[in-house]
Amino acid sequence: IRRIAIVENIIYNNYLEKNENAPSLEEMEEFKECIPWICLKGLVWASENIYIKNKAKDEIKEIILDNPIDEYKETRRMKRHFYLHVGETNTGKTYSSIKRLMEAESGVYLAPLRLLALEIQDKLNSENIACSLLTGEEEDIITYAYHVSSTIEKLQLGTPYDVCVIDEAQMIADNQRGWAWTRAIIGVLAPEVHICMAPEALDIVIKLIKDCDDTYEVIRHKRDTELIVEDKKFNLERDVKKGDALVVFGKKKALAVSAQLLNNNIKTSIIYGSLPYSTRKKQFDRFLSGETEVIVCTDAIGMGVNLPIKRIVFLETRKYDGVSMRKLRVSEIKQIAGRAGRKGIYDKGYVATTKDIDLIRDALKAKPKKIEKCYVGIPESLINIDIDIIDALKTWSSMSLKGFYEKTDITRIIYLLNRLKKLDIDVSNEDIIKMATIPFEENNKTVFALWEEYCMMYSAGAVNLMKPTLKKNASAKKELDELESYYKSLDLNYSFGKNFNMMINNRFICSEKENTANKINELLLTNLLDHERVCIGCGKKLSWDYPSDRCRMCKIINDSKKERYDYRFRERRHADYRKNRRRRRY
């Protein structure tokens, strides 16, 4: 036992040298809960899992307020009135709110997407109302403007406005981004606040307003155009009509469908999530001008520009959500299908699908489940705590909240913080949290590598931020992906430089983004057939949803070759096994 104790002591002293925040042996002895665990699991385990976590909990309890609304003291001194615009998609909720925003001397529009923020900025500026833009990826600050169009995460809480418009408030239920809607509702400094939402969000928003001791009134918006679900299953080869929006879930599928239709002499506009705003706008304009008669899109069509779409067609009724393939939710079907039948252009809107007609029909009749919880983000006071930031966040996340509040999902943030830890990034807690919450696409390898490079540059004290470079000589099929990655890298270059006051070349970024967006649009016009699905064996054309990379004949031949190879491999293994047995015998 003595030897074990001596070795354990040596190991822990080495651990203390590497971890400054770890407790001394005397501190752990004073903490009675640690003693039985030291005997069972050892000093290091007891330090990390018992002492630090419990100490963190005690410190966090002291600094975190019981009610999230108390964080916004200046707002609590203001008397606010809320106008709650409730209705399904395409009912004019946002239109009514923006009208009021335009009448005010100063105001802010808070959007769920950069696309919507840009759209509203364009709208206000076209009406001679100077409006700035503020998003995670770009800014367009007009010095004399009293109106701001912003993504909701970029709301400047200390700035007072006459009118605030919060759009798509049902996203308060999103476990990663919902905190931004909660923060805006309880923290925005505006005496008049308009909130646009789907019906399922009404109850939770009212609870928040009552918790703030503010007043409200509900304005219900009804759909004027009837929405009809077609009984007949849709066939892509023969049923496409002018004014259709064909919905799939994935960029590759959208490109494959468009290529297949182009082969049938049907020109399309293409809309998907990673498409730059200016490219997307050009695709919209082609549809609006009649140059194309059909839109092929992902669920990105669910929010944004109201286009003259007569019929929404679900080419798929299942989507991959990052974990598994699942059926579309009621709220998703309503959001997308609601785009059919634009008010003032069509008297009726139509919805069709290639399969699962009952799923679509039932979803449109159903009432979505009411939202019962709203999410809160990481409190600012937590960032200044004298504990390892990862331990502090994990401990905070495990602590329960009172009432209808729920903590935001910090899985992504913890993952990025651990990556920074491996890179030995030595910056303040405030800066490291800023690094982990900066908007960028971590699933894109090129962009992720650039983010790591930028974090290391800042940590090393660099002043100038390295420009991203475009990978050249990419194949025709990969060129689109490379251009989109480059555009995202330019976004990251701008947002990182702005967040950390590093020197960036604004003129270069704007010029490169414009050129890249134009090149992407050109590729969608000229190289679309490169994305047509063909058999990798013989080159035969395949349908966009064909279940294999090979045509039927090539698959049969390939499978038989594989069977013969597997048979030979098994025979060879058996022969080697028998040979080795004979050798061992002698």
Task: Set out the residue ranges of the language-model regions.
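Conserved segment of the helicase C-terminal RecA-like domain
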Residues: 199-201, 307, 311-367
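Conserved interdomain linker/interface between the two RecA-like ATPase lobes of SF2 helicase motors
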Residues: 83, 199, 203, 208-260
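Conserved Walker A/P-loop ATP-binding site and its immediately adjacent core
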Residues: 91, 95-98, 103-126, 201
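Post-DEXD/H (motif II) to motif III coupling segment of the RecA-like Helicase ATP-binding lobe
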Residues: 170-222
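Inter-Walker segment of RecA-like/P-loop motor cores
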Residues: 124-160
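Conserved strand-helix element at the start of the C-terminal RecA-like helicase core
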Residues: 106-120, 194-196, 239-264, 268-272, ...
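Non-catalytic terminal extensions of ATP-dependent helicases
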Residues: 1-62, 379-586
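Conserved helicase ATPase core of P-loop NTP-dependent helicases/translocases
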Residues: 133, 139-141, 256, 270, ...
